[in-house]
């Protein structure tokens, strides 16, 4: 299998996983009797994890571990956490598991990008084609967990825990597939300190007006997520 095909499949499953549970989650939580505030806190898990994940995973991966191996481990652990989260019926049982799951998933977004960047011959030419498969994966997850089952004569699965189980199963699939990805060894060898772990050394990039505009637009774009 060609490297670009492997990377495209990786990106497809990566975003399929998130779309499978994230979009229909509120339907299941509402049906299970969760309050509006509890549903809001559940959706906040990914945002909290996105803030913490660079500290917990990003800096360590850059220096000590191959990206594809970390991806595999995080996917396997995430699959277990998502499976048990899908069995919960109370907020006190569900929220900690979803938060823990989010802490394993959110770092994989950067990991898959790093793996793709490191293993394509021409980033400007090849990466957009690979990354668009992630968008397609998100769309397909909406079809699979949305109206497609009803079109095939089955009952609606969106207000059930099945989308979460689909996400768990897809995580196992990507965890296994990660061992087939090209080796992406750590590149950074610099000193690891709190400033680096928090990403504060990257703030110097904000001096570039073009990057500042990009940063601000990305911030606004990510708010609904």
Language-model regions: role of each:
Residues 52-66, 149-153:
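Helix-to-loop junctions at the C-terminal end of transmembrane segments
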Residues 12, 81-82, 91-111, 115, ...:
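Hydrophobic core of transmembrane alpha-helices in multi-pass small-molecule transporters
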Residues 140-166:
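Transmembrane alpha-helix termini and helix-breaking/packing motifs in multi-pass membrane transporters
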């Amino acid at each position: 299998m060609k490297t670009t095909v492997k990377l495209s499949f990786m990106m497809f499953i990566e975003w399929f996983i998130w779309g499978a549970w994230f979009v229909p989650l509120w339907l299941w939580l509402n049906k299970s009797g969760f309050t509006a505030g509890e549903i809001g806190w559940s959706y906040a898990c990914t945002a909290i994890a996105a803030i913490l994940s660079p500290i917990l995973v990003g800096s360590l991966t850059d220096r000590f571990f191959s990206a594809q191996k970390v991806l595999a481990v995080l996917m396997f652990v995430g699959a277990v956490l998502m499976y048990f989260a899908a069995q919960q019926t109370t907020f006190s049982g569900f929220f900690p598991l979803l938060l823990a799951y989010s802490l394993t998933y959110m770092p994989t977004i950067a990991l898959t990008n790093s793996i793709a960047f490191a293993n394509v011959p021409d980033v400007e030419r090849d990466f957009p084609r690979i990354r668009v498969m992630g968008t397609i994966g998100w769309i397909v997850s909406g079809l699979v967990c949305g109206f497609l089952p009803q079109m095939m004569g089955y009952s609606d699965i969106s207000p059930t825990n099945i989308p979460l189980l689909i996400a768990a199963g897809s995580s196992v699939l990507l965890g296994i597939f990660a061992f087939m990805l090209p080796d992406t060894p750590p590149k950074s060898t610099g000193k690891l300190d709190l400033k680096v772990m928090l990403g504060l050394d990257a703030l110097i990039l904000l001096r570039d007006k073009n990057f500042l505009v990009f940063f601000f637009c990305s911030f606004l774009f990510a708010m609904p997520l």
